[in-house]
Swiss-Prot record:
It is a single-pass type I membrane protein. Binds to RGF1; this interaction triggers the formation of heterodimers with SERK1. The modification Phosphothreonine is found at T764, T952. This is LRR receptor-like serine/threonine-protein kinase RGI5. Phosphorylated and ubiquitinated upon interaction with RGF1, thus leading to activation a subsequent degradation. Autophosphorylated. The record marks K800 as: Essential for autophosphorylation activity. PROSITE patterns: LRR, PROTEIN_KINASE_ATP, PROTEIN_KINASE_DOM, PROTEIN_KINASE_ST. It comes from Arabidopsis thaliana (Mouse-ear cress). A motif (Small peptide recognition) lies at residues 171-172, 193-196, 216-221, 244, 266-268, 314-317, 336-338, 384-388, 410-413, 432-436, 456-458. Residues 1-21 form the signal peptide. GO terms for biological process: maintenance of meristem identity; regulation of root meristem growth.
């Protein structure tokens, strides 16, 4: 009995266990396969219960009547799978949608076993590797959507076996090769998109013209070349053809006129030539026709007016000629007509006023003549009208006052006459009124105050007269006020000071009199103030010290008196100060030397200043141009020797005395720079005047100068020869002393050292060598390892240990001497934007370079950190690096190539000034075995190497320019040259080009931390973006020099004439 009870108890436990285990064991194989999708994220999909018998009730899952999974649709979830699991057991699967699920790794070839699959959507992930050819087995597949991944390799030709395929989306990947011509067999295909694969090349197969079911064909932003196949005329169902930003050339095939369903034709930014086919006029349903940015010629065919549905017509930036067809006035749905930057002639057809839906009319940069038709006032929806740079004459029609939606009106650079119609100022939305460079006359009407929406009022270079109306001070939103080069008279109304948002005030070249209103000091946002070439009297207002954002102050050619106010020291953003041709007196204040931001120009000439040059001028190390001529200054000029960035100097017609500094700059400038300073003299050391030399207007005779130069050169050569001989003998002696010792290791520090400091250093070789430990490593690069070494006085220096160049036994005396000579050249370089080489020490095995230490790190660390780096700091770093590089290229003889310009080699001091490091070291390392196996390092670092190096193997100044352009793009975008998150792994140059080739605005390239800034700053950044793209031009010949780059960058903040231009920006965004 007891045994029976025991058996019953164990039977009960077994049955209980079976009943509990049964749900897990009964989950179907389909369910088991699906669970592998959530393995990295178990908390996902609470409804996916492994206790269920089937997954048919799970989220995103659909089953057939026999409980087989036929659909898996879980887009926009965070699966976070590093590889897609094997799902081939889902043999009934028809729909698989894993888009935007954070997948990576390759596409499994086993997907080719899912023979019932009708939809495969893996888009918007990080999938890599090739597209498996096995997908060509999916005979029932209708939708293959793999866009926005990192797929590489060529497009498998086996895809052409998918006869049921309707949608093929492969855009925005890294595919290469060409489009298989066999794709012409995909007769069911309706959408075919390949855009954004920049490495995809070759011609467009003519066979694609047989895919008569196509509605969308997109190959934009790729490397496709050749011509547009004429067979595309067979695509009678095509609605969108996007072939912009490619290498496509040739003519536009007239057969496209047969594509009767076409709505969008995007052929902009290509290399198309020839004329616009009149056959395009047959496209009755087309709404967007974008042909801008090609080399099209001929006229606009009048047949275009038959495109009755047209909304956007953009043929700007071509070579089109002839008249603008009046028949375009028939396009009643037209909203954007963009014909700018061509060679159109004739008059503006009045018929355009019939385009009642017109919002934007851009006719700028042509050769149009005649007057502006008064009927333009019929365009009640018009928001922008650009007509600048033509030859339009006559008056400005008062009918513009009827265009009540008008926001921007630019009629600059024409031949307009008459008055500015008061009706313009009744426009409640007008924010930009640009009338520069015409022959307008009369006064500026008081009614200007009615236009409260005005942000930019630019009427310079006309013949306007009378007083500037005080009512202008009521324009509370005005940012730019240009009244320069007119005939305005009377005083400058102090009411202008009420416009507290004003950033630019330019009234130069008028007849304005009286004192400069002290109230202008209330314009705390002012950045540029130009009152030059008027008849202002009195003192420079002390209140100008309040203008903390001012970067240009131009007051020359007036009747100003008194002294420079000491409050000038508060203008710490000032880059240009011109006070020349006035009657200013007294001493130049020491405070002026404290304005260390002065970089472009300081001009105090033709005044009556007395006293010495302030000692504080030694801090103006960024200043490029200084003019102190025609004053009554005296004393020595040794302080000018500290101005290491000077490119232009004039101190003539003063009473200076003593020696002329012996810096390289003073050795190269013309004697006219310091004429009529009878007590100036030349000097060998810059401290004392040379003996036995005559003085004539502060300049020695040419014979004496030549003789001095010869003597100096001879002494230098003799000293150098003696030094090299001693070095050679010491080396031979040390070598013989060590010849009997055991062979040294690769890092042997026991060899005798040679230590050459380039300035006084309180450090010994032992201090340096003992610091070369792993704990002190602060960086590794192409040229060597960098250590931090502490000097006994507490200072810190950076020590770079160069990679070994050759085997110790092979390194001869000539190699040592050559290295010493190269280092001597680098040690003589002095520039505020170049790291100073303090000295070097070497022995038979090791070479060490000593530099200043910069605790703020480098630009790469700054950009990739979490700091909100503002535009001013970025611009400061960009221009500092450019100035340093320009110095190496243009001011060093012979020129020095950097060879490795990158963010890691741009160090930052405590004030975030850019300091170039590692200049010229690549040349020293070219014999290194480390480089022998990676020669590309000699040309720079990955991501920064100029494209021509791949086929020329030559390095030039233009190679450095390309690398600098990449750095500039990194500064603007906040991204690295190559990183996974840049547009699917694209190089930053290609990423920017891709952005500019889509419908995204240029602003989308900029760092998100730079979004939402004032319009003027946005324009500065866009101009800088244009300069960067100029630098990374694929053709070295087309790139600027670094000196030109510096000038262009200076002009970003130097050109008030270009501020606020309402025309197309430097890089034109795609139209839409």
């Amino acid at each position: 009995m007891e045994r029976e009870r025991s058996n019953f108890f164990f039977l009960f436990l077994f049955c209980s266990w079976v009943s509990m285990a049964q749900p897990t064991l009964s989950l179907s194989s389909d369910g088991q396969a699906l669970l592998s999708l959530k393995r990295p994220s178990p908390s996902l999909f609470s409804s996916w219960d492994p206790q269920d018998q089937t997954p048919c009730s799970w989220y995103g899952i659909t089953c057939s009547a026999d409980n087989r999974v036929i659909s898996v649709s879980i887009p926009d979830t965070f699966l976070n799978l590093s590889s897609i699991p094997d799902l081939s057991s889902l043999s009934s699967l028809q729909f698989l949608n894993l888009s935007s699920t954070n997948l990576s790794g390759p596409i499994p070839p086993s997907f080719g076993k899912l023979t019932h699959l009708r939809l495969l959507d893996l888009s918007s992930n990080s999938l890599s590797g090739p597209i498996p050819s096995e997908l060509g087995r999916l005979s029932t597949l209708q939708f293959l959507i793999l866009n926005a991944n990192k797929l590489s390799g060529s497009i498998p030709s086996q895809i052409s076996n998918l006869f049921a395929l309707q949608v093929l989306c492969l855009q925005d990947n890294l595919l290469n090769g060409s489009i298989p011509s066999s794709f012409g067999s995909l007769v069911s295909l309706q959408q075919f998109r390949l855009g954004g694969n920049t490495n995809l090349g070759g011609p467009i197969p003519a066979q694609l013209g047989f895919l008569k079911n196509l509605t969308t064909l997109g190959f934009a932003a790729s490397g496709l070349s050749g011509s547009i196949p004429s067979t595309f005329g067979n695509l009678v169902n095509l609605q969108t053809l996007a072939l912009y930003d490619t290498e496509i050339s040739g003519t536009i095939p007239p057969q496209l006129g047969l594509c009767s369903e076409l709505r969008n034709l995007y052929l902009h930014m290509n290399k198309l030539t020839g004329s616009i086919p009149k056959e395009l006029g047959k496209l009755q349903k087309i709404t967007s026709l974008l042909l801008w940015g090609n080399s099209l010629s001929g006229v606009i065919p009048p047949e275009i007016s038959n495109c009755s549905s047209l909304v956007v017509f953009d043929v700007s930036a071509n070579d089109l000629t002839g008249d603008i067809p009046g028949d375009l006035g028939k396009l009643v749905w037209l909203e954007q007509l963009q014909l700018s930057d061509n060679m159109f002639t004739g008059q503006i057809p009045w018929e355009l006023s019939n385009c009642s839906s017109l919002i934007a009319l851009q006719l700028d940069k042509n050769k149009l003549s005649g007057s502006i038709p008064s009927q333009i006032g019929n365009l009640k929806s018009l928001q922008s009208f650009f007509l600048w740079e033509n030859s339009i004459s006559g008056t400005i029609p008062s009918s513009f006052g009827n265009c009540t939606d008008l926001v921007a009106l630019d009629l600059s650079r024409n031949k307009l006459t008459g008055r500015i119609p008061e009706e313009l100022f009744s426009l409640k939305r007008l924010s930009k009124l640009l009338l520069l460079g015409n022959s307008l006359s009369g006064g500026l009407p008081k009614s200007v105050a009615k236009c409260q929406s005005l942000v930019r009022l630019r009427v310079g270079e006309n013949q306007l007269s009378g007083q500037i109306p005080k009512e202008i001070g009521e324009l509370q939103n005005l940012v730019f006020l240009d009244l320069y080069m007119n005939h305005f008279s009377g005083g400058l109304p102090y009411e202008i000071s009420n416009i507290t948002v004003l950033e630019l005030l330019d009234v130069h070249n008028n007849y304005i009199t009286g004192d400069i209103p002290a109230q202008l000091g209330n314009l705390v946002n002012l950045e540029q103030l130009d009152l030059s070439r008027n008849s202002f009297t009195g003192n420079i207002p002390l209140s100008f010290g309040n203008l903390s954002y001012l970067n240009k102050l131009i007051l020359n050619n007036n009747l100003l008196t008194g002294q420079i106010p000491k409050s000038i020291k508060n203008l710490q953003k000032l880059t240009l100060l011109d006070l020349s041709y006035n009657s200013l007196s007294g001493e130049i204040p020491q405070e002026l030397g404290q304005v260390t931001s002065l970089t472009i120009n300081l001009d105090l000439s033709y005044n009556t200043f007395t006293g010495n040059i302030p000692e504080t001028f030694s801090d103006l190390t960024q200043l490029q141009s200084l003019d102190l001529s025609s004053n009554s200054l005296h004393g020595d000029i040794k302080v000018l020797g500290s101005l290491t960035s000077l490119a232009s100097l004039n101190i003539s017609c003063n009473n200076f005395s003593g020696p002329i500094p012996s810096t390289p700059f003073f050795k190269t400038i013309s004697t006219t720079s310091y004429l009529q300073n009878t007590n100036l003299c030349h000097s060998l050391d810059g401290i004392t005047c040379s003996s036995h030399t005559g003085q004539n207007n502060g300049v020695k005779s040419p014979k004496i100068v030549a003789l001095t130069a010869v003597i100096l050169a001879s002494i230098t050569i003799a000293i150098l020869a003696a030094w090299l001989l001693i070095l050679r003998n010491n080396h031979l002696y040390k070598t013989s002393q060590n010849s009997s010792s055991s062979p040294s290791t690769a890092e042997d520090f026991s060899y005798p050292w040679t230590f050459i400091p380039f300035q006084k250093l309180g450090i010994t070789v032992n201090n340096i060598v003992t610091s070369l430990t792993d704990e002190n490593v602060i960086g590794k690069g192409c040229s060597g390892i960098v250590y931090k070494a502490e000097i006994p006085n507490g200072d810190i220096v950076a020590v770079k240990k160069l990679w070994k160049t050759k085997d110790n036994n092979e390194e001869g005396e000539s190699t040592i001497d050559s290295f010493a000579a190269e280092i001597q050249i680098l040690g003589n370089i002095r520039h505020r934007n170049i790291v100073k080489l303090l000295g070097y020490c070497s022995n038979k095995s090791v070479k060490l370079l000593l530099y200043n230490y910069f605790p703020n790190g480098n630009l790469q660390q700054l950009l990739q950190g979490n700091r909100n780096l503002d535009w001013e700091t970025r611009y400061k770093i960009a221009i500092g690096a450019a100035q340093g590089l320009a110095y190496l290229h243009h001011d060093c003889v012979p020129a020095i190539l950097h060879r490795d310009v990158k963010c890691n080699n741009i160090l930052l001091d405590s004030k975030y000034e850019a300091i170039l490091a590692d200049f010229g070291l690549a040349k020293l390392m070219m014999n290194s075995p480390n480089y022998h196996n990676a020669m590309s390092r000699v040309a720079g670092s990955y991501g920064y190497i100029a494209p021509e190096y791949g086929y020329t193997m030559n390095i030039t100044e233009k190679s450095d320019v390309y690398s600098y352009g990449v750095v500039l793009l990194e500064i603007l975008s906040g991204r690295s040259a190559v990183e996974p998150q840049i547009g699917d792994g694209l190089h930053i140059v290609e990423w920017v080009k891709k952005k500019m080739g889509t419908f995204e605005p240029a602003l989308s390239v900029l760092d998100v931390k730079l979004q939402g800034l004032p319009d003027q700053i946005v324009q500065e950044m866009l101009q800088t973006l244009g300069i960067a793209m100029f630098c990374v031009n694929p053709s070295p010949v087309e790139r600027p020099t670094m000196k030109e780059v510096v000038t262009l960058l200076m002009e970003v903040k130097c050109s008030p004439e270009e501020w606020g231009k309402t025309s197309q920006p430097l890089i034109k965004p795609s139209s839409s």
